[in-house]
Amino acid sequence: MTDRTAFYAGSFDPLTNGHLDVLKGALELADTVVIGIGIHPGKKPLFSYGERVALIERSAKDELGADGGRIKVVAFDNLVIDAARVHGASIMIRGLRDGTDLDYEMQMAGMNQTMAPELLTVFLPASPSVRTVTATLVRQIASMGGNVAPFVPAVVAAALKEKFSA
């Protein structure tokens, strides 16, 4: 039997407990999960690509234990379906917080299925405890000196505190 690889794309700027929740679900479905950090030239991320890789890898080690070794973090600047193919994925993972996410993700899944019928999109609903968490809100709270510890892994909370106290 061949290993099943899933591709989980996002900006992860920063990684949140919501992302980790989806990642845990993805690890139930796949042997390996490739976390694809989308690089968009028009966007100015808070954390550099290298910082995001380090934060994801450290968070996975701290929060997922041995399962953290089943993830791989990569960058991509092309279509997500092309990135998934390059990394040998047969599944694309998408997290859902609410109906707004579902509407958008269904549209994207339909387009992706037309262009890459061999890739299966799997929607994983967020656990109730993380449904309200967004990276945008986390950045806003951190930028105003608020406590983001309930919303992100400890290593990310420390990095945000450092970033905004500089």
Curated annotation (Swiss-Prot):
EC number of this enzyme: 2.7.7.3
InterPro entries associated with the record: Cyt_trans-like, PPAT, Rossmann-like_a/b/a_fold
Source organism, top-level taxon: Bacteria
GO BP of this protein: coenzyme A biosynthetic process
Gene3D superfamilies: HUPs (3.40.50.620)
Catalytic activity: (R)-4'-phosphopantetheine + ATP + H(+) = 3'-dephospho-CoA + diphosphate
Chain residues that bind substrate: 11, 43, 80, 94
Keyword terms, alphabetized: ATP-binding, Coenzyme A biosynthesis, Cytoplasm, Magnesium, Nucleotide-binding, Nucleotidyltransferase, Transferase
GO MF annotation list: ATP binding; pantetheine-phosphate adenylyltransferase activity
SUPFAM superfamilies: Nucleotidylyl transferase
Subunit structure comment from the entry: Homohexamer.
NCBIfam families found in the cross-reference section: coaD_prev_kdtB, cyt_tran_rel
Protein name: Phosphopantetheine adenylyltransferase
Organism: Chelativorans sp. (strain BNC1)
